[in-house]
Amino acid sequence: GALIGRHMDKVAEEAAAQVENAKVEEVTDANGLKAVKVTFDSGILFATNKADLNATSKNELAKFSTVLKNNADCHIDIYGHTDSTGNDGINIPLSNSRAKSVADYLKSCGVSNSQFQQITGKGSSEPVADNGTASGRQQNRRVEIYMYASQAMIDAANAGTLK
């Protein structure tokens, strides 16, 4: 666990250095290991009710793709989120489309398809702020990318060969 923790510390530092318009945090994955969570504000990524990436977003994601390519031993999950405006019939497909747009663009930048594990939308089910305010709704419209240890990284750590 300690080797993976140090490795993921480096991944977090690299992500923070490359990406200006996102929040980088260290979190714990399902295996109890350190992982990196990068949250992109959907206001930066998408126009309201749209899943098409704008030029600024593509620039940010292109920079971030370098981090993913440099850390090919990390698996990636991408989750799209919406605010509570509209119902699940609108928000779940929209959040799915946003997650897929981000994944497709990262793949077009050369990130390996094998790194992607989950690409899904959560609709408005996991708010991080109050949907009763404009600022809260803006915070809830986001895309989260999780980078975590692949089995290959865990095996390398156990074998003492993780760089």
Regions found by a protein language model. Name each.
Residues G1-A16:
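Short, low-complexity, glycine-enriched hydrophobic/amphipathic alpha-helices that associate
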Residues L45-Y79, K107, I145-M147, A152-K163:
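Periplasmic peptidoglycan-binding/anchoring modules of Gram-negative envelope and division proteins
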Residues E20-K23, K63, V102, D130:
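N-terminal post-signal-peptidase region of extra-cytosolic proteins
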Residues M8, K50-K58, I92-S95, A99:
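Solvent-exposed, acidic/flexible segments
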Residues K10, V19-N21, N31-A35, T39-D41, ...:
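Extracytoplasmic
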Residues H81-A156:
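Periplasmic OmpA-like peptidoglycan-binding domain that tethers envelope proteins to the cell wall
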Residues V24-T28:
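Surface-exposed patches in mature extracellular/periplasmic domains of secreted proteins
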Residues A16, E20-K23, K69, K107:
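Signal for well-folded cores of large energy- and translation-related assemblies
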